[in-house]
Amino acid sequence: MQPFNGILFCIHGFLGQASDWELTIPLELRWKSIDLFSKEALVPSPLDFRSFGEAIQKNVGDLPCPRVLVGYSLGGRIALHMLVEKPEIWSAAVIIGAHPGLSDEGERLRRIDGDERWAKRFEVEEWDTVLSDWNSQTVLIGSPNIERKESDFSRKTLADSLRGCSLGKQKDLREQIGKLRLPILWIVGEEDLKFLSIAKQLKKLNPRITLVVIPKAGHRAPWDQPEFFKKCLIEFLTINES
């Protein structure tokens, strides 16, 4: 088997930075990412899944093939929207700890309300307090917190993304994911039980999904176990080189 000669385009999660991927991508691989929440970021308007995807797409056009789309958490949800919109420009995808969308209207409304509360907090509250509370959410417990400086972020963009890209406003993409024909590596941490259950359901919908459960890892699986993640990535890309 030949080594992977393409490029990865990586989309970070909420409160993420492009540099986060440096800890998780093997040195021999080429990759690109952009900061979505920095004060210098070119923020689309209105800020939602479609506009985020279109803004990211502008950074993809000149990249060599094969191209592999990688997305973590919120970045994974953005990546899923991009895949169902224009699957033909990607050779494969790696989705990490991402939700395909809610099907229950009551859940949608509750999530929108919850994200609105977080958005207001990120707009006005003391940075260290809201950051600590964010990292104390059940889904993130068990993973080491990554240092985040207020000066590296636009509070307005963070708040706007919580509103515009709320899980409550996301389409339920299960049907479209089931129809995707490109190979997908779906990564989830062993201790991330909610997302592990979701990933198993999606694997049943699409035989092109390769599900990998990273042991001793939570929602931030690639950063909890970077060497294991690198190994999985290399194996997947080598097998699916095209």
What are these regions (language model features)?
Residues 2-43:
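Conserved HGGG/HGGXW glycine-rich cap/lid loop of the alpha/beta-hydrolase fold
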Residues 51-67:
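Conserved acidic catalytic loop of the alpha/beta-hydrolase fold
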Residues 71-75, 79:
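Gly/Ala-rich beta-loop-alpha elbow adjacent to hydrolase catalytic centers
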Residues 84, 90-122:
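Flexible "cap/lid" loop of the alpha/beta hydrolase fold
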Residues 146-176:
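Hydrophobic, aromatic-rich cap/lid helix
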Residues 180, 186-188:
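Short beta-strand/loop motif that positions the catalytic acidic residue
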Residues 193-198:
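Conserved alpha/beta-hydrolase "acid-adjacent" motif
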Residues 217-226, 230:
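Catalytic histidine-centered segment of alpha/beta-hydrolase-like enzymes
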